Design a protein with these regions (language model features):
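The feature marks the first
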Residues: 1-60
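Intrinsic, low-complexity N-terminal interaction/targeting segments
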Residues: 1-24, 69-126
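Short, structured motif recognition centered on aromatic/hydrophobic residues
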Residues: 25-31, 50, 54, 106-110, ...
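Structured beta-strand/turn binding interfaces of compact recognition modules in eukaryotic regulators
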Residues: 32, 43, 100, 111, ...
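Mixed-charge, glycine-accented linear interaction segment located at domain edges/termini
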Residues: 40-42, 113-165
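Conserved helix-adjacent loop modules within structured domains
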Residues: 58-69
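Short cysteine/histidine-rich zinc-coordinating motifs and their immediately flanking basic loops
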Residues: 165-172
Length: 172
């Protein structure tokens, strides 16, 4: 059986929601490309790994393909709600990140968590989100804010507010 790969190229209307149950958080990533709407769920461990991998990728990109990040284009995903009804396509086992220099796009690859129910081997489905650097950074920041917990956040840009406020790129 051939592996099913779903490409959202380019992925639009990204949304990341978090549902906390006791000490574990379940994340919901939703996006669309054209008429295809995809919803994935993943656990806190995958979220932490994704945020860390994002920063590692950005360290590499800064060295090999430097380009300033446009803070105004980073989506503030905290204010977005999922399209209802929510019907997750799959639960993510792991994420991978890639970069395509020709289009200056990052690729967020989600591999399905398979539970063995049959004797026939099945390849896990993959979903590839072709997104900008700013979109990927928005996902990582949303994950980090969800894991840190509530704190003062700038309503305009989503950055943490220090004791003396901060320089907001969106409102200045």
């Amino acid at each position: 059986m051939a592996q099913q790969i779903i490409d959202l190229n380019p992925a639009e209307q990204l949304m990341l929601d978090v549902h906390s149950a006791s000490d574990q958080a379940v994340f919901l990533l939703q996006s669309r490309a054209g008429e295809h709407e995809i919803t994935l769920t993943f656990d806190q461990a995958q979220a932490i790994a994704l945020a860390e991998a994002t920063h590692q990728l950005f360290d590499l990109l800064d060295k090999q393909y430097p380009r300033p990040i446009n803070e105004l284009e980073i989506p503030y995903l905290d204010r977005m709600s999922p399209q209802v009804p929510v019907r997750p396509l799959l639960h993510v086992a792991c994420f991978q990140l890639a970069y395509q220099a020709e289009n200056d796009r990052t690729v967020l690859i989600a591999a399905e968590l398979r539970r063995i129910r049959t004797l026939e081997p099945q390849e896990p489905r993959l979903v590839r989100f072709w997104i900008t650097r700013e979109q990927l950074l928005g996902i990582a920041r949303r994950i980090e804010r969800a894991l840190v917990g509530p704190g003062p956040i700038c309503p305009a840009c989503g950055q943490p507010l220090g004791p003396n406020g901060h320089y907001c790129v969106r409102s200045n």
